[in-house]
Amino acid sequence: MNPVEPLAAPQRQHLRYLLEQGLPLASRPYRVLAERIGAGEDEVLEQVRRWDEDGLFRRFGVILHHRALGYTANAMLVLDVADAEVDAVGRALAHETIVSLCYRRPRRLPMWPYNLFCMIHGRERGEVERQIEALLERHALRQTPHRWLFSLRAYKQCGGRYTAPPADLERRHG
């Protein structure tokens, strides 16, 4: 084992591969991962902490499959917010419990004037429309150019994949 790292190189590769597949749904997911790579839970937690400190993770988050949970009315609210205000408006909207995702993107003029995007999920279209109307009212955005776009189709969601599976992993777990 490398004295600098809590896990040996093959264990690190296996752990990275498993993390990219998603955390197991368990009360102690890192213990489950530790068992799968033949290590201790503390070693796995320490390795993840070091990777985080080293900047290995750009984002570590949850991907919810909303449709499987009954949230079939999913809308992207797009707004054309003044550049001087977009960061503050984005932060305010991101704190709303109904907003699952909020981010800024460059406008693509002349066809696409919107620079702020918010995802809102609901069980029925009318429910989502009412939530959007209330959101616009609460944040005084009714006069800000905006549209809401409902999803017509669900695409596969998954996190980034950067690690090839370890060669012996396919034989053991494939």
Swiss-Prot record:
Instruction: Enumerate the catalysed reactions.
Output: siroheme + 2 H(+) = 12,18-didecarboxysiroheme + 2 CO2
Question: Gene3D superfamilies, from UniProt?
Answer: 3.30.70.3460
**Lyase found in the keyword field:** yes
A GO BP term, please? heme biosynthetic process
Reported consequences of knocking out the gene? The nirDLGH mutant lacks dissimilatory nitrite reductase (NIR) activity. The NIR activity is restored by adding purified heme d1.
UniProt keyword annotations, A-Z: Lyase
Tell me the GO molecular function terms. Answer: lyase activity
One of the Pfam families matching this protein, by short name: NirdL-like_HTH
What Enzyme Commission number does this protein have? 4.1.1.111
Part of which pathway?
Porphyrin-containing compound metabolism
The record's listing under InterPro entries reads: AsnC_trans_reg2, HTH-Siroheme_Decarb, NirdL-like_HTH
Describe the protein's quaternary organization and the partners it interacts with.
Probably forms a complex composed of NirD, NirL, NirG and NirH. All proteins are required for the total conversion of siroheme to didecarboxysiroheme.
| UniProt family annotation | Belongs to the Ahb/Nir family.
Instruction: Give the function comment from the record.
Output: Involved in heme d1 biosynthesis. Catalyzes the decarboxylation of siroheme into didecarboxysiroheme.
Q: What is this protein called?
A: Siroheme decarboxylase NirL subunit
